């Protein structure tokens, strides 16, 4: 059971980490000042969620690893993120559409996770759901 949970946590964490870094690429390059500030902040939210998920995965796996081991000490083939989040930022519209897809899906996911029996996951989900709702409001949904 712990291997399945660890794998699921890593999938979620990798999605959030990679997309967080992709969004931060817009710092100083977005078409308007509002977006120039909002996109990197959304990226920071995602990276914060990734940190929580990596930390929880370390606790579940119980092999004396740190969140940094999962986030930075793996080769590129060991990441288990979905392909959507790693796609390059071709242009601003593409980035916003990618963020829309991810945020809608994750808001639904985190809403469902709030009903979990896993208290740690519920805690992460509570914060992440609020952030996803905020991200959706920033992209005017």
What is each of the regions a protein language model found here?
Residues 3-26:
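Short, Lys/Arg-rich amphipathic segments at extreme N-termini
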Residues 41, 47-65:
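Carboxylate/His-rich catalytic cores and anion/metal-binding grooves
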Residues 84-137:
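Internal, conserved structured core segments that host functional sites
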Residues 1-10, 73-98, 116:
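Acidic/His metal-coordination segments adjacent to aromatic residues that form catalytic metal sites
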Residues 140-141:
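Conserved small/polar residues in nucleotide/adenosyl-binding loops
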Residues 19-41, 105-122:
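Helix-loop segments that flank and shape redox-cofactor active sites
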Residues 15-23, 49, 53, 102-109, ...:
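Amphipathic, well-ordered alpha-helical segments in soluble domains
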Residues 4-11, 30-49, 95, 120-134:
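Alpha-helical scaffold segments that form or flank carboxylate-/histidine-based iron centers
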